[in-house]
Amino acid sequence: MIPELIKENLFLEDGRALSIETGELARKANGSAVVRMGNTSLLATVVISKESKEDFKFIPLTIDYREKYSAGGKIPGGYIKREGRPYDEEILTMRLVDRLLRPLFKDNYYNEIQIMISLLSYDINVLPDGLAGLVASTAVSISEISFQGPVSTVRIIRINDAFIINPGIEEIKKSDFYLDLDLDLDLIVGGTNNYIILVEGEMREISEIEMMEAIVKAHKYIQLQIEAQISLITKNKKFIKKKLYKIELYNYYYKYINFNLNVFYIKEKIKFISYEEIDYIYKSCLFKQKRSNKIYNILKKIKFHFYNESIVINNLEIDIIFDEIKKEIIKNILFKENIRLDGRSLDDIRNICSQVDCLPGVHGSAIFTRGETQALSTVTLGSSLDVNKIDNAIMRAKQRFYLHYNFPPFSTGEIKLLKGVSRREIGHGNLAQRALKNIIPTTYTIRVVSDVLESNGSSSMATVCASTLALMDSGIIVKRPVSGISMGLIMNYLTGEAIILSDLLGDEDYIGDMDFKITGTEYGMTACQMDIKISGITYDVLSYTIFKAKKGLLFIIKKMLTTLSCPRKSLNITATKIYTFYIPKKLIGAVIGSGGKRIQEIQVSTETNIKIKEKNYLGVIEILGKNETKLKIAILKIKNITFVPKVGTIYKAKVKNIKKFGVFVKISKYLEGLLHIYEISWLTKVESFIRKGDIISVKYLGKNNKFRKIKLSHKMIFSRYYLNKNLK
């Protein structure tokens, strides 16, 4: 059967074209689509299982995103020449697409859904992650699955106050090398035609108004892409009425319930047994662990009750109904009494305490505790040898700052099998890293590790606060302290009411409809990530949340500064000191010496580590050492080697040898020249007034290109009368 290509085109303001295609590739999938922009091409497929999975409490959705090395014209490095496990950038894109699509599936979907996105071709002028949401939405929209889409994403950056949609890696890189290019925003926005679903990115202390301006700008392009998807769907002659791949929860109950009892009876029965007790527990302002234990005991009692009454209902069904009742009770307390589970009002921040220098053996450390969430961050300083090298299908780069986030199971009082770094840990670590990367200097390679020791919500934001304090404790001169806060949205679906919560608890996140993580300094935002469970939020809700977060951020910063008001004046005594300076490229060989002997001698004698590299026609010298005195000696030695005299400048020179035709003098340790007899004085005798070891003044006249020697003069410093009088 000959493939039938169906295609839709649209154009950006700058004239670039974007196309959406279906019908030609991957026809065995329930839905497939290709998006092309420039030479960047992405293929997305969606496959739905024929049988439902009845043991899930959530939508069994799996997103897989892979960037093939062939897309960028590369072969994988290493011994195995094929793509392996996904790298961090791929995992971050998987999480991004998941957050975009998951809210738009029905809650009672129990058929497995697998969406696979592949980068087939890569163009340096178009980054693929901004198109991943578009191609995935198109594939799902033309499949049989019931989906409240279409949706789309765009990447938007701002350089010199000008917005660019779906930029390339070169545009972002240029801002790092050219001072006149100021990239202060890099954002991915996702949404439906009327609402925003996804906001994620980093900023350089921009205002809340500028943030909303970028979101509104991006949403206009999202709407264009949604129109293109709708047009593509209507062109698809084979597009059939969507089938609802799901298992109706209530119908499922009927199969297991005797005596013609229905699910409403069961729900009312569970309410009768537990409602007042649960309500009392949630109003008692208990600690999370104690509250969870009491709730768990109630659940066990309910299961035991149904078992004794011989009502055939499985534990999963009880769990789902019990969760619904818990959510209903918590929402009632919030909306009717404006009191939260820990007794706070809607705007209150939990109690904060912090400490620094808690681990004396590391370069910098801090513990940040907010309520029942606690993070321990450590800072390790290194050199350019310790950079995090990124070499994947589309990018080759070096990170001088990187942050690793660990979320061990004991932080929530659980036992779990440790299987390496989870996707969640990678995502939270990346968010904290983006929050801090633009406020630290680039002299050092900096590795921050954050271990969550206790968690009851907002652990990634606690990581940002702890890491800021740890950086300040290490002596790194941060531009300004950064704090983080999680903002929540709770909707009442019956009345349409909505409330915004500051500093989310874990249970509030679980029952809520939005978790909006925002980080920033007193001057503006540095990073954000929005995760919602509903089909979108309006500009008004988004704007109100962002402006409300500012108040919380400033409060947290004020609390942090009571622990450490400014960065330490010097690096920790255990930290390696680094000194970086530039030399002319042609003098690199002089520093290294014959066979590397000179640089090795300096390193051994001063107990330092010296790294030399070329950059922009200069030699970059990086000297590392723990002893400040020896480090200064190494610096002095290299500066002596690379000493370049200035024409017309007078220097003190030491006489090394005397000849009839002049004297050999040294104006630095490694720079020697001949002071000819005719340049010594207006007299003809030398020995009568100059001896070996004398220190005399000489004027540097430049180089003798013929003999490749330096030219020096003594007599040009003074007048003839002065010399005759003083040198006789």
UniProtKB/Swiss-Prot annotation:
Which Gene3D superfamilies does this entry report, sorted A to Z? GHMP Kinase, N-terminal domain, K Homology domain, type 1, Nucleic acid-binding proteins
Pfam families, from UniProt?
KH_1, PNPase, RNase_PH, RNase_PH_C, S1
KH domain sequence ranges: 576-638
Q: Per its UniProt record, what InterPro entries does this chain match?
A: ExoRNase_PH_dom1, ExoRNase_PH_dom2, ExoRNase_PH_dom2_sf, KH_dom, KH_dom_type_1, KH_dom_type_1_sf, NA-bd_OB-fold, PNPase
Q: Please name the SMART domains in this protein's record.
A: KH, S1
Coarse class of the protein's main subcellular location: cytoplasm
CC cofactor: Mg(2+)
Provide a GO biological process annotation.
RNA processing
Residues of the S1 motif domain: 648-715
Q: Does the keyword Nucleotide-binding apply?
A: no
Presence of the UniProt keyword Zinc in the record: no
- State which residue ranges cross the membrane: none
What EC number(s) are associated with this protein in UniProt? Answer: 2.7.7.8
Where does the protein end up? Cytoplasm
Q: Which GO terms describe its molecular function?
A: 3'-5'-RNA exonuclease activity; magnesium ion binding; polyribonucleotide nucleotidyltransferase activity; RNA binding
Catalysed reaction(s) here are: RNA(n+1) + phosphate = RNA(n) + a ribonucleoside 5'-diphosphate
Q: Which GO terms describe its cellular component?
A: cytosol
Which keywords describe this protein according to UniProt?
Answer: Cytoplasm, Magnesium, Metal-binding, Nucleotidyltransferase, RNA-binding, Transferase
Q: Which domain of life is it from?
A: Bacteria
Question: In which residues is Mg(2+) bound?
Answer: 509, 515
Instruction: State what this protein does.
Output: Involved in mRNA degradation. Catalyzes the phosphorolysis of single-stranded polyribonucleotides processively in the 3'- to 5'-direction.
The UniProt family comment states: Belongs to the polyribonucleotide nucleotidyltransferase family.
**Protein name per UniProt:** Polyribonucleotide nucleotidyltransferase
Species for this entry: Karelsulcia muelleri (strain GWSS)
Record gene name: pnp
